[in-house]
């Protein structure tokens, strides 16, 4: 495995291997969830590139850009074990050179859920992912379903801009106690870590009510919110039941309905989701 920092060098590597590269875009501080994407990518292409870049344009004012965990040596170990050929770890100056002025924006599906409380976030996401697609030229790219809205946005961007790239969404990987794996989990104190379990428990409660016959979204929201509110300190950013394709709100739930939530535990904002009809 090699590490490439230069955009020009990454482009040269890609030109020599065009047509058989799988890309796993990440912000680093890798965990088993990231590794699952890399292992699957290994099955789908001759060469696997994992990008590690904490993208400044997707962080807003007073968000955790400076404190976002970083550990390239740790990341190299995980990537190598997962079968990655190249870590592409560019600098912000290389990705966004002086007087950078070009951004890509996907409308409508970016304005609600995470987009409502993080204005500009998805503009940064789509811009950096489009740049990575152009630099690495993959035939397939892997994203985790924990960031369900992000996955939907990327798929829309790929369709609308005619990127000849297959987008693969991979299942959420969870800790043994149900907490969705996230690089931000490391920022939780032990007490906060325990409180954070309310996200997966609220999903479980809503799904149990759904299996019991409840179809009213308003009623299901009350069931899920009650689990989080019982913990006192976690603050709900959003708790929504949406159509999984359009991400539009619903009044009645069915087996394809997406339950998506974002909750702030202490200073850490966590997200999770599940499809009601799936285990």
Curated annotation (Swiss-Prot):
Compartments where located: Cytoplasm
In this protein, the active site sits at 34 (proton donor)
* Binding-site positions, beta-alanine: 58
Q: Which keywords, in A-to-Z order, does the entry hold?
A: ATP-binding, Cytoplasm, Ligase, Nucleotide-binding, Pantothenate biosynthesis
- A GO MF label: pantoate-beta-alanine ligase activity
Which Pfam families does the protein's record reference?
Pantoate_ligase
Amino-acid positions noted as binding ATP in the UniProt annotation, renumbered to this chain? 27-34, 144-147, 173, 181-184
Chief location of this protein within or outside the cell:
cytoplasm
User: Which EC main class describes this enzyme?
Assistant: ligase
Q: What is its EC number?
A: 6.3.2.1
Among InterPro entries, the record links this protein to: Pantoate_ligase, Pantoate_ligase_C, Rossmann-like_a/b/a_fold
One GO biological process term is: pantothenate biosynthetic process
Mind telling me which GO cellular component terms the entry cites? cytosol
Residues binding (R)-pantoate: 58, 150
Q: What catalytic activity does the UniProt entry give for this protein?
A: (R)-pantoate + beta-alanine + ATP = (R)-pantothenate + AMP + diphosphate + H(+)
> Pathway membership of this protein?
Cofactor biosynthesis; (R)-pantothenate biosynthesis; (R)-pantothenate from (R)-pantoate and beta-alanine: step 1/1
- How does this chain assemble? Homodimer.
Family (UniProt): Belongs to the pantothenate synthetase family.
Q: What else is known?
A: The reaction proceeds by a bi uni uni bi ping pong mechanism.
Q: What does this protein do?
A: Catalyzes the condensation of pantoate with beta-alanine in an ATP-dependent reaction via a pantoyl-adenylate intermediate.
* Protein name listed in UniProt: Pantothenate synthetase
UniProt organism field? Geobacter sp. (strain M21)
């Amino acid at each position: 495995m090699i590490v490439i920092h230069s955009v020009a060098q990454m482009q040269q590597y890609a030109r020599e291997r065009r047509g058989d590269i799988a890309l796993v875009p990440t912000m680093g501080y890798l965990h088993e969830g990231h590794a699952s994407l890399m292992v699957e990518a290994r099955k789908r292409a001759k060469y696997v590139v994992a990008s590690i870049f904490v993208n400044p344009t997707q962080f807003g004012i007073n968000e955790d850009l400076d404190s976002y965990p970083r550990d390239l040596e740790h990341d190299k170990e995980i990537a190598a074990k997962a079968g990655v050929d190249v870590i592409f770890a560019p600098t912000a100056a290389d990705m966004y050179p002086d007087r950078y002025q070009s951004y890509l924006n996907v409308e409508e599906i970016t304005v609600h859920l995470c987009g409502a409380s993080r204005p500009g976030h998805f503009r940064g996401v789509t811009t950096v992912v489009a740049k990575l697609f152009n630099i690495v030229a993959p035939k397939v790219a892997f994203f985790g379903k924990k960031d369900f809205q992000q996955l939907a946005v990327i798929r829309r961007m790929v369709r609308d801009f005619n990127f000849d790239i297959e987008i693969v969404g991979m299942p959420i990987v969870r800790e043994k106690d149900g907490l969705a794996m996230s690089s931000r989990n490391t920022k939780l104190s032990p007490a906060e870590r325990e409180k954070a379990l309310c996200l997966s428990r609220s999903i479980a409660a809503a799904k149990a009510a759904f299996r019991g016959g409840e179809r009213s979204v308003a009623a299901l929201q009350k069931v899920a919110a009650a689990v989080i509110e019982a913990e006192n300190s976690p603050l709900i950013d959003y708790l929504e039941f949406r159509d999984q394709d359009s991400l539009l709100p619903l009044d009645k739930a069915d087996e394809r309905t997406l339950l998506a939530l974002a909750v702030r535990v202490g200073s850490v904002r966590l997200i999770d989701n599940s499809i009601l009809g799936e285990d």
